[in-house]
Amino acid sequence: VYKRQVQMGTRFVTTEECDAADAYKQAYLSARKEDIVIVKSPVGMPGRAIQNAFLEKVAAGERFMTGCRHCIKTCDPKTAPYCITRALINAATGDVDNGLLFCGSNAWRAQKIERTVDIMEEMA
C-alpha cells in the first residue's frame, strides 16, 4: 500500500504549542521569500535558513567557535565558522541575531501564530 507523506516541521514553528522563543517565531512571520537562503553548515551539509545578522557576520568572515565540545564528528572546530549547537540554541532561546534560523522553503508563508489543532483541521 502506497501512502503519500509530507514533512511539515516549518508549519508548526509558528504555533502556540511550539516551545521556541517568540523572537524565533517572529523571524518566521517577518521573513520574505528572498530571505530564505541555502547555507552550508559547519558539518558540511546544506540547509535552508532565514537570512539574519548572524549569517551576515559569518559571510563577512567572522568566526564564532568557542568552547567546542566535539559533539558532531564531521565538524572541525579549527575550520568551522561557528558552533552549530550554540547557533541553534541561541536562535531557539530568542537570541536570533546570534543564531541560526533553520527553516523550510515555505517559512516566508507563515502569517500568524496559530494552534496546532487548527492546522490539523485545515489539512483534514
Q: Which positions does each model-derived feature cover?
A:
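Conserved active-site-proximal phosphate/metal-binding subdomains
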Residues: 3-124
